[in-house]
Amino acid sequence: LQTSAADVYAVGDAIEFPHPLTGKPWLNYLANPANRQGRIVADNMVFGNTTRYEGAIGTSIAKVFDMTVASTGLAAKRLKQFGIPYASSTTHSASHAGYYPDALPLTLKLTFDPASGKLYGGQCVGYDGADKRIDQIALLIKQGGTVYDLIKVEHAYAPPFSSAKDPIAIAGYVAGNIISGAMPVATWRQMAEADRCDTLFLDVRTREEHAFGAIPGSVNIPLDELRGRIGELPRDKEIYIYCAVGLRGYLALKILTGHGFTRVKNLSGGYKTYATATAPIENKTATIRTNGKTDTQHTGERIKTLKIDACGLQCPGPVMKIKQAIDSIGEGERIEMVAT
C-alpha cells in the first residue's frame, strides 16, 4: 500500500490494487477491505513494511425485500471480459434439511477453471443461509482453493441449520462431475439457442410437472419409464435432458449413456433455472377480482378452503400434492398451499 512517494500510503475505497485472481488493477468499494488496509498501513508505518496487502476479491451481499443476494470473486461476465476460460455450475438446494420445518430454497452458481477446478467465483440467492455459504466460498477462493475443497468443508450440522450434504458440498460435487466429464452439461442459453433440427429436448419429470410448464417442443418421458421407452429416442440427434433442478436429469443421462447414447447433456440447474432466466419481465398491477362465489365480503358465505403444507417436499412432491387437491375439491372451493 506504499505509493511511489516513500512516506505516502494509499488506503480506502478510491485506491486501485491488483485483483488477486487476475492481477489486473481494480477498485473495490467495500468497507471491510478499507478497514483492513488502515490497520496494515498503521503497522507498516510503525514497524516498517512488514505486512503486504494481498488484495480483495469483492465479497458483497444485499437484502432485496425478503431475499438475500450475495457474490464473491469473478462472475461469468467478468471472466468473459478478461478472456479467461471457465466453466460454471448451478445448483438448487435448501437452507437446511428438507424434512425440518421452514427449509427455504437456496440457489448457488460457481465459476471455476474447467481443467484444474480452481474456484473463480460464487453467487448465492436465497431467503436464509446465503451469507454463510458465500463466506465459505470466499475463504476458499482467497486461499486458492478448488471446487473439490468445497466438498471437504466441515460445517456445523444439525437439521435446523444445514443438511448432511451442505449446499456448497452439493455444488462442489456437481462442479467436479462437470470437470471429469461424468456429467456433460448444457446451459440455459445453449438450450435457448440450440438448432432444433439437430437436437431433442427430453423432459424426464412427471406428466403433472410437465403440464405445469415445459421447454417448448420437448418430449416428456418420465424418468421411471425411461428404460422401457429408450427405443423412442433418436440416436442421430443431440439430446438435452432436463428435470426440475438437475438430479433426475443426471440419472437419465447415466441411463442413456449406459445404453450407448453419446451425444447427451444435462441442463445445468434444470427447468427451474431455464424458466427463471427466460421469463419475460412484467410490471403487474394488483387487482381484486370477484365472481360472486369466492368473495365472502359480497356473498356472506364462508368459502371452504383446503390448506396444504408442502414445505420441505422434494420435487415432484408439491406438484403431486396440488394435483391431488385439485382432484378432490368441489366447485367454488379454494386451495391454499405453502411450499418451499
Name every feature range the model reports, one short phrase each.
Residues D295-T340:
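Domain-level signature for proteins that mediate thiol-based redox and metal-cofactor handling
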Residues A14-D128, P159-S163, P167-E193, T199:
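Mid-to-C-terminal Rossmann-like scaffold of FAD/NAD(P)H-dependent oxidoreductases
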Residues D128-V147:
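A short, polar/charged loop-to-alpha-helix boundary motif
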Residues E16, T206, E225, G312:
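Short, glycine/acidic-enriched loop or turn micro-motifs at the edges of active sites
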Residues T3-A5:
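Rossmann-fold NAD(P)-binding glycine/threonine-rich loop
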Residues A10-V11:
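A structural signal for the hydrophobic beta-strands that form the central parallel beta-sheet
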Residues Y148-P159, S163-R189, E193-L200, R207-Y240, ...:
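Rhodanese-like catalytic fold shared by cysteine-dependent sulfurtransferases
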Residues K118, P234-E238, S328-I335:
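Short, surface-exposed connector motifs at secondary-structure boundaries
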